[in-house]
Design a protein with these regions (language model features):
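Thiamine diphosphate
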Residues: 1-163, 167, 170-322
Length: 322
């Protein structure tokens, strides 16, 4: 099952389980979404629970906030990452604040699905990775890296009592398949996953970058006879900082890989958390392998912008050699 199918399965199962779950967004009904993630759900659940909306991102999320306050569990879809910025006033100004405003008497259980990132030969405002834009206090930010954890994290996001931004790496949608069990794994929001155990170096990444990172880690580990610990964050906010810090206390070295621009990104927060918790254990400067501080380029230059296996491998080797 690929990631599109896995997310579709999670949506279908959660809608069957809980009648308060509904879907709204641009073309999510009749067309099944721009990437067909909601394909077949209109036929299964009808137009009252799978709602096609106008092209108005702020209106979609604002409506979802009202639905959630009224007792529903809406899942909204933004067609592309670059269009999602229009809904930020609703996400930050209303959804993120409602628990605090009511002193936790009321919450806003809603999910905002956002296809994000490059690698699909699209325009720059269809290909951006700006994860930190959504990490307001009161909002949880989740990024799956494969079909199996996408299905489980979507179930956790829908059941969560607070607003969740569910970032879906577009180039992972149909890039590979995994066996997805009938029942979702117990994969709580806020918990990172150690993909590979090691003692010589820690590598941290998330989302679509996990595929080239795994390849680079395997290449270096094989060539150098070292063991490298690999952590998939899965949740960016709240970050499982202790999982990273405890790994660094064991390995003494850290490389963080992200697709987004170098400055003001999730990698910077990972490094700050490690400095707070494990600085005295570091045996080398922490390395960032990232995109560049430029507007996301057109698809003809994406291969230069998005970190590939070679750049990641070089970053790992430089850190090991320090």
């Amino acid at each position: 099952m690929n990631m599109v199918q896995a997310i579709n399965l999670a949506l279908r199962q959660e809608m069957e389980r809980d009648e308060s779950v509904l879907i709204l967004g641009e073309d999510v009904g009749k067309d099944g979404g721009v990437f067909r993630v909601t394909d077949g759900l209109l036929d299964a659940f009808g137009p009252e629970r799978v709602i096609d909306t106008p092209l108005a991102e702020s209106g979609i999320v604002g409506s979802a906030v009202g639905m959630a306050i009224a007792g529903l569990r809406p899942v909204c879809e933004m067609q592309f990452d670059g269009f999602s910025y229009l809904m930020i006033p609703q996400l930050e100004g209303n959804a993120s604040r409602y628990r605090a405003r009511t002193r936790s008497q009321r919450t806003v259980p809603m999910v905002v699905r956002i296809p994000y990132g490059g690698g699909v030969r699209a325009l720059e405002h269809h290909s951006e990775a700006r994860e930190t834009f959504y990490a307001f206090p009161g909002v949880k930010v989740v990024v799956p890296s494969g079909p199996r954890n996408a299905r489980s994290l979507m179930a956790s996001a829908i059941r969560d009592p607070d607003p969740v931004v569910f970032l879906e790496p577009k180039r992972s949608y149909r890039a590979f398949k995994e066996e997805v069990p009938e029942s979702a794994d117990d994969l709580p929001i806020g918990k990172a996953q150690v993909v590979r155990q090691g003692t010589d170096l820690t590598v941290v990444s998330w989302g679509a970058m996990m595929r080239p990172v795994i390849q680079a880690v395997e290449d270096v580990a094989s060539a150098r006879s070292v063991t490298i610990e690999l952590i998939d964050l899965l949740t960016l906010a709240p970050m499982d900082a202790e999982a990273v810090a405890s790994s660094v206390r064991k390995t003494g070295r850290l490389v963080v890989v992200q697709e987004s621009p170098r400055s003001f990104g999730v990698a910077s927060e990972v490094i700050a958390q490690v400095n707070d918790r494990s600085f005295l254990y570091l045996e080398a400067p922490v390395k960032r392998v990232t995109g560049y501080d430029v507007v996301t380029p057109y698809f003809g230059r994406e291969n230069l912008y998005i970190p590939g296996v070679e750049r990641i491998r070089n970053g790992i080797e430089e850190t090991l050699d320090f």
